Regions:
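TRAFAC-class small GTPase G-domain
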Residues: 1-234, 244
Length: 244
């Protein structure tokens, strides 16, 4: 008997620091894919407020439904992310590519952080949950020469270290590419993301990709959804979909 694809549902979680543009991204995805009643006003994805808790939307595609969870990125909310890991089929991690501080050479960030944390990694025996909380203590708004990319790196590493996301496809979106002060996606990929994924604390080989987007303007959003769509199908043996 053939499976009714309209009943196939995959869960995706949107993660990233506060003000990265996750809620705007979800609004843009909804505007692209969710049918609107006749006469309904055109959505304005630019009018959003910071997420406290979660937003959720079911996105109908031709061969599946994507249930997308937008989880708050404030420090106080990040400890709750782990409760979504076991049931998710993909992770979208949103990076604010315009928040790089005064020094755009983000490749220096990795070497500086590596030298300062090399000793502590071997002395900690904490669980991933404890490590996640400890690494985020004292990390706040942008104030360093690197803006919040250092904070972003630590948070992304914490996500990757959790055993519950092993094998889960991860899409990193370099958001706010419409801004003149943004960092190009290739620099985020080479200077930050690749070092995290392939570094000592990363998980080595992983199904992942880095794409540029402007959640505000909608550019790159469809490509992001299509990548997630293809990868959750490819990984359906490892993480089967939910049948609704």
């Amino acid at each position: 008997m053939e499976t009714d694809i309209s009943q196939t549902e995959y869960s995706v979680i949107l993660l990233g620091l506060d003000n990265a543009g996750k809620t705007t991204l979800l609004s843009q995805i909804k505007a692209l894919y969710q049918p609107r009643p006749e006469g309904a006003p055109t959505p304005n994805p630019g009018k959003t407020v910071p997420t406290v808790g979660q937003n959720v939307a079911t996105i109908p595609l031709h061969d599946m439904n994507l249930k997308i969870w937008d989880v708050g990125g404030q420090i106080s909310m990040r400890g709750l992310w782990q409760s979504y890991y076991t049931s998710c089929h993909a992770i979208i991690f949103v990076v604010d590519s315009a928040d790089v501080g005064q020094d755009p050479d983000i490749t220096r960030l990795i070497s500086r952080r590596a030298s300062s944390t090399a000793g502590t990694r071997n002395t900690r025996g904490n669980s991933s949950a404890e490590a996640f909380s400890e690494e985020n203590v004292g990390i706040g708004a942008a104030s360093s020469e690197f803006g919040r990319l250092d904070e972003c790196r630590q948070v992304l590493e914490s996500v990757l270290q959790n055993a519950d996301v092993a094998g889960v496809p991860i899409l990193v979106l370099a958001n706010k590419q419409d801004r003149e002060d943004c960092v190009e996606v290739v620099r985020i990929k080479e200077g930050l993301v690749r070092k995290v994924f392939e570094g000592e604390t990363g998980s080595g080989v992983r199904d992942s990709r880095v794409l540029p987007v402007s959640a505000l303007l909608g550019s790159g959003v469809q490509a992001a959804v299509e990548w997630v769509q293809s990868r959750v199908k490819w990984n359906k043996e490892g993480r089967p979909p939910v049948m609704r």
